[in-house]
Amino acid sequence: MNYKETLDWMFNKLPMYQRIGAAAYKADLNTTIEILDYLNNPQDNFKSVHIAGTNGKGSTSHSLASVFQAAGFKTGLYTSPHLRDFRERIRINGQMIPEDNVVTFIEQHKQKLEELELSFFEMTVAMAFDYFSK
């Protein structure tokens, strides 16, 4: 698959709340834990800050990423939604994840992603953690 085909698959193939409604809702992290176990728990390979809340998460995240990067830390940033390009969601030191990394992640793990019926969010979190760990 090329990059556009990969994005089409990501947005259209997997169940999303917007497409199938309440059936897509998952009240636990079991599927996320399962995909991260499959990926050898990449989130354990780096320190992280999780920013939660109703408003201001994006601004706060970008500000903290800038501060950490200016202090010399290698800084990964995962945000959503994106404005123009899916790759805006996943960055290291301000640089978006390369298109070929997106394609390669999906190609390498497509069977497992389909098997687990991951939500778009679960899949992109796994992709970000995998990218940050390398």
State where each predicted segment sits.
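Short functional linear segments
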Residues: 1-53, 60-62, 66-71, 78
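ATP-dependent carboxylate-amine ligase catalytic core
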Residues: 22-26, 34-37, 41-44, 70-134
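Short active-site-proximal "capping" loops at secondary-structure junctions
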Residues: 56-57, 83
